């Protein structure tokens, strides 16, 4: 019911001015008690039928906000989760860690003292779109050394880096690794 100073909404449209006001309201809420980290997530519904989906998106965005800014206030719109890295932030930390350990774990469990070099090679190789020469250049190594390291990664993980699906699994596992807190 609309009254003086009240805004009304029709199905599929937010009340006039609600969306543009949200950043300003969020800034006020965050500033009211800066020592308390506030987290919020938003999702968009284009119709009444889309409300359940919008709620699910908002919950996922909220989980992402909590993950990416555990000690600071953050408001994330589900529409901003447009890449694999940002999409993965909405997955619970325990699930991300378990996935990473499952996929990359053999590198660590093998007792391989060169696991750090293998992980670095894997990260650079994937960042260079599987280019042997660009990876070698970025790591200041000979191409044969890159080939050897990639073969070792494939051996320990059971993944084939010439397969797109295996590359995606390994990239996701790297992104899911637990992050160490920054040193002061």
Residue ranges and their predicted role:
Residues 1-184:
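Cytosolic nucleotide-utilizing catalytic cores of signal-transduction proteins
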